[in-house]
């Protein structure tokens, strides 16, 4: 896609009979030479963005993502509040996604949860921490409640920093992807606002794939409400955190074998259509799956070797 160091000029010359775009760039390439784009039914519901793509959207039956977490790094399932006497929200997303509306929304959450803190991590904070603290101060949040981290030496330190967060907050309208998977893997539930396009629905896709649909907010007020409810229900929050890695490990999001089969089946369908002028079969004919609701706020809820700077 249209990201740094892309090779779209090469692909525009159609070096292969079938070309597919996937991951990294959450939109169309605009190139007629690219035939397909991998996605799923949550990130791109049928009929919502099809006409806006030069590619044919090929929706994988589960998630368009597959994640493999680092098994050697232990997730801290205890709450930071136990040690620090306050709930800590957090986001490790690119701060370009943290818009004025996001800052205003997160500030409302901090106001509603007394003494709560917000931990932010992005390489830009090495030089701009004071600027972002000032933005929150303009919303009435004192600087001591905003903790900023810049780049860390390696992936291990990066992942361990999630252990300082109790609840993750997904930015909008541009959600996190890798950061959401990392947070969930490290036992941090993430609240995400359901948007109108792929970039704003990735969080919902990830949460849906691991069965945490009640962390998907329908609107900003619901987003704030979910964050407050979760912060005020410490027993439930601990239960969810204790079970979160296992939930991920047994979900379609981390099922590499079946994900590979879905991709291989898609390739077969593409080639069959290419050689036989045949319409794609079941992968494109499935109905849009409804996001099922799980009442995680009820007492019945029970489930719940990369290196370098990060």
Predicted regions and their residues:
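Generic beta-strand/beta-sheet core signal
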Residues: 22, 39-40, 92, 121, ...
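Active-site-proximal region of nucleotide-activated glycan assembly enzymes
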Residues: 13-79
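Generic, well-ordered alpha-helical scaffold segments in large soluble proteins
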Residues: 105-112, 135-139, 161-164, 168-171, ...
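A donor-sugar binding/catalytic signature common to diverse glycosyltransferases
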Residues: 1-16, 20-31, 154-202
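C-terminal amphipathic helix plus adjacent low-complexity
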Residues: 93-95, 108, 124, 129-134, ...
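Catalytic binding pocket for nucleotide-activated donors in carbohydrate/polymer assembly enzymes
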Residues: 143, 171-256
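Conserved catalytic-core segment of nucleotide-activated headgroup transferases in glycan assembly
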Residues: 62-153, 157, 161-163, 280, ...
């Amino acid at each position: 896609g249209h990201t740094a160091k892309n090779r779209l000029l090469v692909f525009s010359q159609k070096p292969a009979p079938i070309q597919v775009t996937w991951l990294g760039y959450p939109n169309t390439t605009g190139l007629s030479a690219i035939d397909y784009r991998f996605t799923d039914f949550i990130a791109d519901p049928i009929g919502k963005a099809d006409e806006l793509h030069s590619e044919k959207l090929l929706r994988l039956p589960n998630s368009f993502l597959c994640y493999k977490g680092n098994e050697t790094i232990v997730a801290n399932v205890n709450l930071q509040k136990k040690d620090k006497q306050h709930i800590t929200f957090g986001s490790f997303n690119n701060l370009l996604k943290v818009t004025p509306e996001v800052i205003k929304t997160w500030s409302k959450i901090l106001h509603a949860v007394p003494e709560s803190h917000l931990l932010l991590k992005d390489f830009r904070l090495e030089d701009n921490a004071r600027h972002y603290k000032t933005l929150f101060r303009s919303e009435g949040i004192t600087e001591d409640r905003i903790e900023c981290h810049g780049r860390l030496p390696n992936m291990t330190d990066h992942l361990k920093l999630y252990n300082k967060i109790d609840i993750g907050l997904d930015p909008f309208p541009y959600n996190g992807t890798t950061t959401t998977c990392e947070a969930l893997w490290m036992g941090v539930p993430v609240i995400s606002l359901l948007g109108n396009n792929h970039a704003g629905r990735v969080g919902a896709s990830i949460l849906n794939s691991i069965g945490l649909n009640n962390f998907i907010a329908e609107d900003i007020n619901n987003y704030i409400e979910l964050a407050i409810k979760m912060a005020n229900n410490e027993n439930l929050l601990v239960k969810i955190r204790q079970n979160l890695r296992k939930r991920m490990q047994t979900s379609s999001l981390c099922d590499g074998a079946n994900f590979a089969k879905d991709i291989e089946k898609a390739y077969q369908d593409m080639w069959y259509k290419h050689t036989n002028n045949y319409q794609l079969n079941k992968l494109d004919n499935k109905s849009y799956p409804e996001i099922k609701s799980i009442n995680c706020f009820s007492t019945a809820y029970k489930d719940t070797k990369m290196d370098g700077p990060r």
